[in-house]
A protein has these predicted regions:
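Hinge/lid segment of periplasmic solute-binding proteins
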Residues: 113-165, 181, 190, 216-221, ...
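Extracytoplasmic/periplasmic solute-binding protein
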Residues: 153, 157-161, 166, 190-239, ...
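Long, aromatic- and glycine/proline-rich binding clefts that accommodate carbohydrate-like moieties
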Residues: 48, 303, 308, 357-409, ...
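Extracytoplasmic "Venus flytrap"/periplasmic binding protein-like
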Residues: 71, 75-142, 149-151, 173, ...
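Extracytoplasmic/periplasmic substrate-recognition and gating elements
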Residues: 74-75, 80-85, 98, 156, ...
Length: 438
């Protein structure tokens, strides 16, 4: 057996004498004072660290943001905006956001979104509604299409920042040479192209984005609008891809190739391939986005081109496919008020003017299209306003990415001749209906 022995500890405490008592009293006061000074100096630094608001963005635009980020951080010492630079491919940025949300709490407080991401992200519950943070009067300052593109089921999930819209570029000098006005209809576009080519003034009449990618869906949205057709009615879920108007829209694009108005390789062209053809003087007409204007203004066709809304059938109107970017707030963020502070900063007119002057992007605020500073540098902005005020949205449905993939595949089949327009559009409509039912 084990034996335990108690150990007694005796401590003798003697009353301090007056000298030692005074010493310890002063020593204790000195220690307390020192600790107090340390707490006053250190605790605020610990408890008042800046709150970090993180956002993922394409690398190119992230670099362009750097002056604004620096200004924001200097202006808000208790906040720190941190930009994570992702790939320049927008689809890959969307994938990174999606992966972050699917894995749980997203590391991003702000969500910088393409307009076609909004419904998918909102339907999944990944975004916080902004409806209680902004009034309708404040939203009236923005292009209506950009605001509507940020809504899902009646609530606002994206605050517009910059916009985009498809349009028709045309050579003013070539049209002047044949004594013609710019085209208003599809038929006039074909006739003028043919005339210019027959007179050997230009190799190709009209170039557009025919590659199988998102740009094909965007371009086709405008042609479809011009024929009076529709893709998906977001309210009723009706699909219009197999209707006569949609088939006629596909046939028009096929005709531009078969009649030699567009080059055979147009079915492999994205924005840049078509821009270079037009900018190098090899095409009379071009469908593209606003970014082309600044680049073409520094080329051999400077001063020899203009822009207008897309052509259309006489009995129907024109529509510019709406693009653009804006801000949402992650539903899982612990810093939602701070994220809104960032959005408010980027919404200030003086901040936007500074940014657009440097980058050439197009504002989403209507008043900025006539701002003297911006117009002095980008004289086309007032004309561009006429284009983007007549927008056509890609279908604002939660399954947009899958619907676009379906359309791209079957459009490509029709344009390359592996299926007839009727066959391709019927199949596209059937797959889209099945998708929406799921």
């Amino acid at each position: 057996m084990f034996k335990f022995h108690a150990i007694k500890l005796r401590i003798n405490i003697r009353p301090p004498n007056s000298k030692s008592q005074g010493f310890w009293l002063h020593f204790g006061l000195a220690i307390a004072t020192f600790v107090g000074i340390i707490c006053l100096a250190v605790l605020p630094a610990i408890t008042q660290q800046p709150v970090t608001v993180k956002v993922l963005i394409q690398a190119l635009e992230g670099t362009q943001w750097e002056p604004l980020v620096e200004d924001f951080n200097n202006e808000h010492p208790n906040l720190r905006l941190e930009v994570v630079k992702g790939p320049n491919n927008t689809n890959l940025v969307e994938d990174l956001y999606t992966s972050a949300f699917l894995l749980g709490d997203s590391p991003y407080d702000l969500v910088y979104m393409d307009i076609v991401w909004v419904q998918k992200f909102a339907a999944a519950g990944w975004l916080s509604s902004l409806s209680d943070r902004v009034t309708e009067t404040q939203l009236d300052a923005y292009l209506e299409g950009d605001v509507n593109g940020g809504r899902y089921e009646g609530k606002l999930y994206r605050m517009p920042f910059r916009t985009d819209g498809g349009m028709l570029y045309y050579r003013t000098d070539l049209l002047k040479e044949i004594g013609a006005e710019p085209p208003e209809t599809f038929e006039e576009l074909m006739t003028l192209s043919n005339t210019l080519q027959e007179q050997e003034l230009v190799p190709w009449g009209y170039v557009w984005q025919g590659k199988q990618y998102e740009g094909l869906s965007a371009m086709f949205t405008e042609i479809l609008e011009g024929y009076g057709g529709f893709w998906i009615d977001a309210d009723t879920q009706e699909v219009g891809l197999d209707k006569p108007e949609a088939i006629a829209a596909v046939e028009f694009l096929r005709d531009t190739i078969s009649e030699g108005i567009s080059p055979p390789g147009v079915t492999t062209y994205a924005e840049e391939e078509t821009r270079r053809l037009f900018q190098n003087g090899n095409s009379a007409f071009l469908r593209n986005w606003p970014y082309v204007y600044s680049l073409a203004s520094d080329s051999e066709i400077a001063g020899k081109f203009a822009i207008k809304p897309m052509v259309h059938q006489p009995e129907h109107g024109s529509g510019a496919c709406l693009g653009g970017w804006g801000f949402g707030i992650s539903a899982s963020s612990d810093n939602q008020d701070e994220a809104w502070t960032v959005i408010e900063y980027f919404s200030r007119p003086e901040v936007q003017i500074k940014y657009f002057l440097e980058t050439g992007y197009v504002p989403a605020k209507t008043s900025l299209f006539n701002d003297p500073q911006l117009v002095a540098k980008f004289s086309y902005l007032p004309d561009l306003l006429n284009v983007v005020q007549n927008p056509v949205l890609r279908p604002p449905v939660a399954q947009y990415a899958q619907a676009s993939d379906i359309l791209q595949r079957y459009l490509s089949a029709a344009l390359t001749g592996s299926q007839t327009p009727e066959q391709a559009m019927q199949a596209a409509a059937n797959e889209t209906r099945a998708l929406l039912k799921r």
